[in-house]
Structure formats: structure tokens, C-alpha cells
């Protein structure tokens, strides 16, 4: 039974790789691109429609037979919460952005603080998470040295020498990625300009 589930997951990944390119797809196009049967493609699309991962767009132009249905990724299926911590001359800045699957900002909130404490950060984070968005992943960019959630050197003194990942995991359920701000910029540059 495990091999059947593994094969199903592999097939779902093939379909997702196509749909996550942001284009509109027909069932026939997906079946051709992935080399999956029309029946398998239909079953996967039905499951994705039911879970609201994709949405029906329209019927495509007919070539003489029945019109094919067109599908695309549902942009609000999942969201990413991007958090940037930044120290200014006299204050600490917390920048929160909720981003949909088409890389559009659906919510943005900037906070400023004189102390920049972990407690302030958690309070702000919980407030943003209450917005009811489908946040699946939180990506935290901070000005400091980070190793598996442990912050060594950091412009936010109160966060320094603390395992911020463990602190966050106790408070929130979403997957958390923490990275140095320069590394985040490099990753972003790669995906925007080279990918």
C-alpha cells in the first residue's frame, strides 16, 4: 500500500509543479506535460479543487469537441508571512508582510519600538497571525548571526544569545524559517533574477 501512496504523491507533485508556475492549464495540457493518464490527472484535479488549492477559470476555445476546462492555482490557498527585523538609529523596526501564492502582498504592517524585545515581537506576531489569513510558513529575516534558530550576534540586543526558533515554536504552529538578512537577500536575488 505504501508504494501506491508514494506513486500518488509523486503524481500530485508533478501536477503541482505545473500549476505553481502561475499559468492557466487544461487537464489535457497537464496530462501531456506530466505524462500522466487523463484519468489520473482528472482525479488529482478533483482533489485539488475540493481542497481549494486550485480554481476553475473558464472553458477553453473548442476545437470541435467538448470545451476543456481551464484551471489555475488558487492564490489564497496558502500564504507566507515575511518578517524583517531592522534596527534604525533610535528604534527597532518590525516589518510584517503576508504574501499570496502569486507573490502579491495581501497585508502589511510596520511596527516601531524603542526596546526591540522578544516579548514585543511575539505580541506583534500574534496580532498579525489573527488576521485569519492562511499562513503556512513564516520566514524571519534578522540582522545577526543565526544557526538553527540560535541567535549569536544581533542588532536586536534582547534577541541575542536566545534560541528564537524554540521560543516561536512554543507559541505558534506554522513552519518557521529563520535566516540572516544578507542570506535572505541573496536567496531572493537568486529567485528573482536567476531562476
Predicted features by range, described:
Residues 1-27, 31:
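Extreme N-terminal segment that seeds HTH/winged-HTH DNA-binding domains in transcriptional regulators
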Residues 56-80, 178-195:
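Conserved phosphate-binding catalytic cores of ATP/NTP-utilizing and phosphoryl-transfer enzymes
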Residues 19, 30, 41-54:
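Basic amphipathic alpha-helical segments that dock to polyanions
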Residues 105-110, 114-126, 134-194:
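Glycine-rich phosphate-binding loop and adjoining helix at the ATP-binding site
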Residues 65-106:
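Gly/Thr-rich phosphate-binding beta-strand-loop-beta motif of the actin/hexokinase/Hsp70
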Residues 4-9, 23-25, 40-43, 47, ...:
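Short glycine/proline-centered loop/turn elements that form peptide/ligand docking sites
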Amino acid at each position: 500500500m505504501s508504494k501506491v501512496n508514494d506513486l500518488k504523491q509523486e503524481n500530485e507533485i508533478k501536477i503541482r509543479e505545473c500549476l505553481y508556475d502561475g499559468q492557466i492549464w487544461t487537464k489535457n495540457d497537464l496530462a501531456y506535460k506530466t505524462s500522466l493518464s487523463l484519468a489520473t490527472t482528472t482525479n488529482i484535479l478533483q482533489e485539488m479543487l475540493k481542497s481549494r488549492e486550485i480554481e476553475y477559470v473558464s472553458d477553453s476555445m473548442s476545437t470541435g469537441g467538448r470545451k476543456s476546462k481551464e484551471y489555475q492555482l488558487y492564490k489564497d490557498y496558502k500564504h507566507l508571512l515575511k518578517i524583517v527585523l531592522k534596527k534604525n538609529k533610535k528604534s527597532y523596526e518590525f516589518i510584517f508582510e503576508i504574501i499570496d501564492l502569486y507573490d502579491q502582498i495581501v497585508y502589511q504592517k510596520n511596527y516601531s519600538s524603542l526596546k526591540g524585545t522578544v516579548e514585543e515581537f511575539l505580541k506583534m506576531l500574534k496580532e498579525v497571525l489573527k488576521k485569519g489569513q492562511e499562513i503556512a510558513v513564516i520566514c524571519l529575516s534578522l540582522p545577526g548571526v543565526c544557526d538553527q534558530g540560535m541567535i549569536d550576534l544581533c542588532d536586536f540586543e534582547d534577541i541575542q544569545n536566545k534560541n528564537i526558533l524554540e521560543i516561536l515554536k512554543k507559541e505558534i504552529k506554522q513552519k518557521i524559517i529563520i535566516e540572516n538578512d544578507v542570506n535572505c537577500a541573496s536567496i531572493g536575488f537568486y529567485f528573482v533574477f536567476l531562476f
